[in-house]
């Protein structure tokens, strides 16, 4: 997810997306621990998406 796509979302949608990504990251970590994870790059993608969402939320909070 790109930063422009994230800024187009409302705050509630961003928080919901962040929650979804955190759940996905949790599941991916379990898959990695059990050796079932095939696409290991997905871990960093999800972490970066969470960081992007948090960054946009923080920017909006500072602009208010």
Curated annotation (Swiss-Prot):
Protein name per UniProt: Large ribosomal subunit protein uL29
Family: Belongs to the universal ribosomal protein uL29 family.
Keywords from the named record: Ribonucleoprotein, Ribosomal protein
Top-level taxonomic group: Bacteria
GO terms of biological process kind: translation
Cellular component GO terms held in the UniProt record: cytosolic large ribosomal subunit
One protein family per Pfam: Ribosomal_L29
Gene that this polypeptide is encoded by: rpmC
GO molecular function, one term: structural constituent of ribosome
InterPro entries (UniProt xref): Ribosomal_protein_uL29, Ribosomal_uL29, Ribosomal_uL29_CS, Ribosomal_uL29_sf
């Amino acid at each position: 997810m790109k930063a422009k796509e994230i800024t187009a979302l409302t705050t509630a949608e961003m928080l919901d997306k962040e929650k979804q990504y955190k759940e996905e990251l949790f599941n991916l970590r379990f898959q990695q621990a059990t050796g079932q994870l095939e696409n290991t790059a997905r871990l960093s993608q999800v972490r970066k998406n969470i960081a992007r969402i948090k960054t946009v939320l923080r920017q909006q909070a500072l602009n208010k």
